[in-house]
């Protein structure tokens, strides 16, 4: 019980930190961990150039906290702060690729690695009956953080078409 309370307090503190980062202009998904349904609006306002640090680059350099599930030399995996399914985590490359449409031929090995890591962590999270991988690209694709990332969602029956 005490451990659960400490975990809840820690998560709330992390979410407040992320919300404060958003107030300072960083790219933040969700509002203190609660989906507010405005991801499309955020995508329309997001800066696509990669000129300023994204929330993901700040998680990579550990200046923002995250619930990290896995990391290696090429990528980092952490839980989404505004989960859209019982299990929802992100796989991001350490290399700052703003959009999947901006990936180069030289990124082929890295992109394959991201997919294999997504599979590995999905299995570790108990998603044996299936899951969904999502990559948003650009404003029309509702990309709200311009650092390539793969959403992995599962833990319930997902619906189709997605929207």
Swiss-Prot record:
Q: Which residues carry this modification: N6-succinyllysine?
A: 45, 128
Segments forming domain HIT = 55-163
Q: Name one GO molecular function term.
A: adenosine 5'-monophosphoramidase activity
Enzyme class of the recorded protein, top EC level: hydrolase
Q: Which residues carry this modification: N6-acetyllysine?
A: 119, 128, 139
Give one Pfam family, short name only. HIT
Enzyme Commission code(s) on record:
3.9.1.-
- For binding AMP, which residues are annotated in this chain's numbering? 63, 80, 136, 142-145, 149-151
Segment annotated as transit peptide: 1-17
Matching SUPFAM superfamilies: HIT-like
GO biological processes: apoptotic process; lipid catabolic process; steroid biosynthetic process
Q: Where in the cell is it found?
A: Mitochondrion
This protein's GO cellular component annotations are: mitochondrial matrix; mitochondrion
Can you say what this protein is called? Adenosine 5'-monophosphoramidase HINT2
GN (gene name): Hint2
